[in-house]
């Protein structure tokens, strides 16, 4: 198992976002703004879904990595730290998924 974490990736996204857009894909996406980054996130999500549906495990692994990376870029642009997302996941997993979903529908 790798010791690499989403927090590590978040730090890399932060560092690379400060580079020149001509030298870094991350900086280029951040400079292009949320519409471009969100579009790329959507494209990667579709590619991951297609890999899952076709049962292509290798491609799904590759696309899942792309999806996580682009999600962190979108969060960076929105100034939402990964810590906030993890706190929300922790809150949700404190109860059953069905109960949590029902509580969202009633609010």
From Swiss-Prot:
Pfam families: PRA-PH. It catalyses: 1-(5-phospho-beta-D-ribosyl)-ATP + H2O = 1-(5-phospho-beta-D-ribosyl)-5'-AMP + diphosphate + H(+). It is found in: Cytoplasm. NCBIfam families: histidine_hisI, PRK00400.1-3, PRK00400.1-5. Its EC number is 3.6.1.31. The gene is hisE. Pathway: Amino-acid biosynthesis; L-histidine biosynthesis; L-histidine from 5-phospho-alpha-D-ribose 1-diphosphate: step 2/9. The keyword ATP-binding applies. It comes from the Bacteria. Keywords: Amino-acid biosynthesis, ATP-binding, Cytoplasm, Histidine biosynthesis, Hydrolase, Nucleotide-binding. This is Phosphoribosyl-ATP pyrophosphatase. InterPro entries: HisE, PRib-ATP_PPHydrolase-like. GO terms for molecular function: ATP binding; phosphoribosyl-ATP diphosphatase activity. Belongs to the PRA-PH family. Signal peptide: none annotated. GO terms for biological process: L-histidine biosynthetic process. It is an enzyme of class 3 (hydrolase). GO terms for cellular component: cytoplasm.
């Amino acid at each position: 198992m790798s010791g690499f974490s989403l927090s590590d990736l978040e730090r890399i996204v932060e560092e690379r976002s400060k580079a020149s857009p001509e030298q870094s894909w991350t900086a280029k996406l951040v400079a292009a703004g949320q519409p471009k980054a969100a579009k790329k996130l959507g494209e990667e999500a579709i590619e991951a879904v297609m890999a899952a549906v076709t049962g292509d495990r290798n491609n799904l692994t590759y696309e899942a990595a792309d999806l996580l990376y682009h999600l962190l870029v979108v969060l960076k642009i929105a100034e939402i730290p990964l810590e906030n997302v993890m706190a929300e996941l922790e809150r949700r997993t404190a109860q059953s998924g069905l109960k949590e979903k029902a509580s969202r529908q009633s609010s």
